Amino acid sequence: MLDIQFIREHPEVVKESQRKRGESVELVDEVLRADEERRSSLKQFEEARARQKEIGKQVAKAAPDEKAKLIAQTKELSEQVASFKASADTADEQYTTAMWQLSNIVEPQAPEGGEDDYVVMRKVGQIRDFAAEGFEPKDHLTLGEEVAGIDMKRGVKVSGSRFYFLRGDVARLQIAMLTMAVDQAQEHGFILAITPTLVRPEVMRGTGFLNSHADEIYRLREPDDDYLVGTSEVALAGMHENEILDLSDGPLRYCGWSSCYRREAGAAGKDTSGIIRVHQFDKVEMFVYAKPENSDAEHQKLLAMEEEMLAKVEVPYRVIDTAAGDLGSSAARKFDCEAWVPTQGRYRELTSTSNCTQYQARRLNIRERVADGGTSPVATLNGTLATTRWLVAILENHQQADGSIEIPKAMRPYMGGKEVIEPRKWEA
């Protein structure tokens, strides 16, 4: 949620942000109209209530011949108070509805445009020339099947499309990757949290995911009302809902480990083979509460953490600055790290890190104590540190001519010292 005082004073800034996102500019005027109506209705209610109280005091002191008149006025005012209260409640509801529809203000540095208008900030690593090595690379699913590590057929049999089993060394590879991510996060002062994967509607709404991503989210049927999370960001944001945090010693940093669930409602026909786009996956997510003035610097730290992990798994990647029209409603700015996938001949997203400024904190009422003794919303940030999709890039970029997969050096201690995953027959 945005600061209404800022909207009143700088409506053109908010309108420009909405324009860059490709969202309704008129919504800003709707918010301002609703705000004016809310304040006007509330003022009428408060004035009528004050008159009602004053006359109530006069009734107690009035002479018998005046008391009847005052009581009649009190009854008339009671009806007015009730009417003004109803108007104020309606106006406040309209204001709240409009305010919650507004997306975060895009940072000026974010590129303009849509999904394809990102800016490449840098490319890191050498793309392998498989032709020079004398063999055609296999895709991650073929490799996973040949080492008896990815079983899509049985995943579909058990749960439907876009489900899978990870088995054997590929399952261990995922655990190794996620554990390595946790170790790295803890070395940098992050607190490990294994988070709930079901959250209340208020928490899902507070993080902004019901604005632009509602169709991607699984929801339980009645009588239950919870949502399945697509990232532990949601639970980590909700963890400090309605709290006042002490950030005097620096940001509060978490890394959350959880299973994640996404409907992929808009992905019909996309990435139907393999584990690039699936309904369930595991992820280690970084989440930070920081002072607003420190959020940009903290954003760069999260990006550096992601690049540190990518260096450990030894895959070529690029960093992009996401365009305003491709930002989620909560993000003011977002950087993605995309790894090279040899068989697709293109980069695919592995991580994203977003600076959500004070947007989520206002919606969830998460504040810090400030110098004058009052409170102010904190800034929140998030970033992916490892997830199931990384296996795609690891398998394809580390494959050998004989179908084996060389395990990245940094991951070997987490694999019991194993250096290579060899092709093998399915045991069952």
UniProtKB/Swiss-Prot annotation:
PROSITE patterns: AA_TRNA_LIGASE_II (PS50862). It holds the Pfam family tRNA-synt_2b. One of its GO terms (biological process) is selenocysteine biosynthetic process. Pathway: Aminoacyl-tRNA biosynthesis; selenocysteinyl-tRNA(Sec) biosynthesis; L-seryl-tRNA(Sec) from L-serine and tRNA(Sec): step 1/1. Consists of two distinct domains, a catalytic core and a N-terminal extension that is involved in tRNA binding. It is found in: Cytoplasm. Belongs to the class-II aminoacyl-tRNA synthetase family. Type-1 seryl-tRNA synthetase subfamily. L-serine binds at residues 231-233, 285, 384. Its main location: cytoplasm. Catalyzes the attachment of serine to tRNA(Ser). Is also able to aminoacylate tRNA(Sec) with serine, to form the misacylated tRNA L-seryl-tRNA(Sec), which will be further converted into selenocysteinyl-tRNA(Sec). NCBIfam families: serS (TIGR00414). Its EC number is 6.1.1.11. PANTHER family: SERYL-TRNA SYNTHETASE (PTHR11778). It comes from Bifidobacterium animalis subsp. lactis (strain AD011). It is an enzyme of class 6 (ligase). Keywords: Aminoacyl-tRNA synthetase, ATP-binding, Cytoplasm, Ligase, Nucleotide-binding, Protein biosynthesis. The keyword Heme does not apply. This is Serine--tRNA ligase. One of its GO terms (cellular component) is cytoplasm. It catalyses: tRNA(Ser) + L-serine + ATP = L-seryl-tRNA(Ser) + AMP + diphosphate + H(+); tRNA(Sec) + L-serine + ATP = L-seryl-tRNA(Sec) + AMP + diphosphate + H(+). It comes from the Bacteria. One of its GO terms (molecular function) is serine-tRNA ligase activity.
